[in-house]
A protein has these predicted regions:
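Non-catalytic linker/capping segments at the edges of enzyme domains
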Residues: 1-27, 31-33
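A generic structural signal for short beta-strands and their flanking turns/coil linkers
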Residues: 10-12, 22-24, 68-74, 85, ...
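Hot-dog-fold acyl-thioester-processing enzymes
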Residues: 28-57
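Hydrophobic residues in beta-strands and at strand termini
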Residues: 28-30, 78, 125
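Hydrophobic beta-strand-centered segment that forms part of the acyl-chain substrate-binding groove
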Residues: 55-88, 93
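HotDog/MaoC-like acyl-thioester-processing domains
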Residues: 80-84, 88-128
Length: 128
């Protein structure tokens, strides 16, 4: 990520890494600001991580185009409780149209094949 992170991304202490397949991964370390009940992540922190992963992936795909993604719907499915360890997220663009983009994001901890949450986010691609 860069030095001009939105305040919520800074609060979550998000950082990026390159995955083995070259995909950008978003990483959220476990810390006091993301705790829900003791030993578990807060659902809002997980949703924020998923949204930043989706937005980041879409922003990379839109590089060089004068379009700015604006979320119009977000659906999060919580699959497992997020525990007290680093959480990773990545996103896949399912559809990139002229005006709308559909992105799916997944969050996991130990094993990418066992997600703790997923999100489907629809973006309006707005021109300046």
């Amino acid at each position: 990520m860069n030095d001009s992170l939105p305040p919520y991304a800074e609060l979550l202490q998000l950082r990026t890494e390159q995955g083995e397949d070259g995909q950008t991964l978003f990483v959220m370390p476990f810390h006091d600001d993301v705790v829900g009940r003791p030993g578990y992540l807060h659902g809002g922190a997980i949703a924020g991580l998923l949204e930043f992963a989706a937005y980041g992936e879409l922003s990379l795909a839109l590089r060089g185009r004068d379009l700015h993604p604006k979320p119009i719907s977000v659906t999060v499915d919580y699959l497992l409780g997020g525990r007290d360890r680093d959480t990773y997220a990545a996103a896949v663009i399912e559809r990139l149209g002229a005006r709308i983009a559909n992105v799916e994001a997944f969050a996991w901890q130990k094993d990418r094949a066992t997600p703790i949450a997923s999100a489907r986010i629809n973006f309006l691609l707005a021109a300046d």
